[in-house]
Amino acid sequence: MAMAVDFKMYVDQACRAAEEFVNIYYETMDKRRHALVRLYLDKATLIWNGNVVTGLEALANFFEMLPSSEFQINMLDCQPVHEQATQYQTTVLVVTSGVVKFDGNKQHFFNQNFLLTAQSTPNSTVWKIASDCFRFQDWASI
């Protein structure tokens, strides 16, 4: 019974972290993009439609070149990642999908997956992005 209670606690923690993170991430992306890299680990990796960006400086340069955006999240899912798979680092998988409109471009469907890791300090826990994978989901015209 204790294992079921422990797992439920991890799932609840993952859900709270994911909801808070998604609100912060997309609001920051749309309104304060210059601050977005603060949500990433120093050696985080972003894969944006197949293009790999690694490290805070490269991420800052990449986000700076994107046109302004309006994200609408239609779906959010999350789950804790077993600590044996992450060298006992508390980690959450967050999956989102929705629509985004970048200035000067048509609206696109997208999905985005994040691996968040808990960074603990004596007073709090902050979730940071270790890995981020973004992909447009538009169907090709036939």
UniProtKB/Swiss-Prot annotation:
The keyword Lipoprotein does not apply. Residues 17-136 form the NTF2 domain. GO terms for cellular component: cytoplasm; nuclear pore central transport channel; nuclear RNA export factor complex; nucleus; perinuclear region of cytoplasm. It comes from the Eukaryota. It is found in: Nucleus; Cytoplasm. It holds the Pfam family NTF2. InterPro entries: NTF2, NTF2-like_dom_sf, NTF2_dom, Nuclear_transport_factor_2_euk. One of its GO terms (biological process) is poly(A)+ mRNA export from nucleus. Keywords: Cytoplasm, mRNA transport, Nucleus, Protein transport, Transport. Regulator of protein export for NES-containing proteins. Also plays a role in mRNA nuclear export. Associates with NXF1, NXF2, NXF3 and NXF5. This is NTF2-related export protein 2. It comes from Rattus norvegicus (Rat). The lineage of its organism: Eukaryota, Metazoa, Chordata, Craniata, Vertebrata.
